[in-house]
Amino acid sequence: RPPRAQGHEVAAISPLSGGCVARVACADLRGGERVVVKWAVAPGARLDVEAFMLRLLGTHLGDLVPRVLHDEDDLLIMSHIPNDGVRSDAGMGALGEALGRLHGVGSSAFGLDRDTLIGPLRLPNAWGDAWTDFYGERRLRAMAREAHEAGRLEASDRRRVDRLCERLG
């Protein structure tokens, strides 16, 4: 669905790389604004969940995160962040500083009020009191279970993940 469906007329569009559940393109709108558009191509893609995550990151990182302009289950329109597309020491340093700011965000518990996604995989985020329990159960074991059920992780490796999680706790 093109951005015109949301009241915008596209002057030019060019594909961007990336995305495992959606196609991504840069769109120049007739009014002069440049936006990034993602539209779902994988079954069950939830671009509205990505929009939630971008908004949450934006509360901590401001203009380093694209601003969500419109979202639906299968469509996401966000601001374009100008860049030259070249990896640099300065860019990697800025990334490190941003990650440091995120790691400085405190809370009395670990989790979120809703589950999120990483690509096509659901990330459970039920609240927990201990980081080791949260990480072991909701990241390591959850991903190992998904990978095993998809036939991408042997049962012996899943048991190894389980043993690691037991040692974490």
What do the PLM-derived regions correspond to, one by one?
Residues R1-P3, P82, S107-G169:
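An alpha-helical support segment within catalytic cores of ATP-dependent transferases
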Residues G7-P15:
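Conserved N-terminal boundary motif of the eukaryotic protein kinase catalytic domain
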Residues A11, V65, E166-R167:
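A generic local structural motif
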Residues S14-D133:
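ATP-binding pocket architecture of kinase catalytic cores
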Residues P3-G7, L61:
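A broad structural signal for alpha-helix termini and local helix breaks/kinks
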